[in-house]
């Protein structure tokens, strides 16, 4: 529901992931250079993109004439954050399915075809209903049918490509007045340790997201 801190938590993500490797820095720099990003400078910080929910499918995954990369490519090796997920256009959300599966996006127009990198961590936030509350909240103003239509904007096929879905409750006054939780620096320390353990198990540069069932 509104005020639960889900958007704030997502926007803290840029301070948590491990830095880009040397090869990843070059990948991100090439994308930024190809897009003519103003004021871009090479850095080890991972990209964080948060497009508005009115973005078109072409703006999200790429397209247009001439062909241009979309937000998913600009977020390559970083985070693509979709706030108010169920407010996005259905065709834009559905266009994410193949890139999330393959880590790249194929763009075609007339005789031109380009395959662009799109290996991202997708993070999204959504309310349980159009009014922001959902049927379990006595203050919910939405009809059951309206809530059903709202949630149907996230298809089962796209939901299957989201590894983790977490319900976030609105914090109580008591919890807000209690001891503070972990800060971003502490979380980052745990993430870096977990990444090293994962590299020892899978090999340098490989993550659980890229591991196969075999």
Question: Can you name each region flagged by the protein language model?
Answer:
Residues 41-80, 112-113:
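Conserved alpha-helical scaffold flanking the Walker A/P-loop in AAA+ ATPase domains
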Residues 77, 83-85, 95-96:
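Walker B catalytic acidic pair
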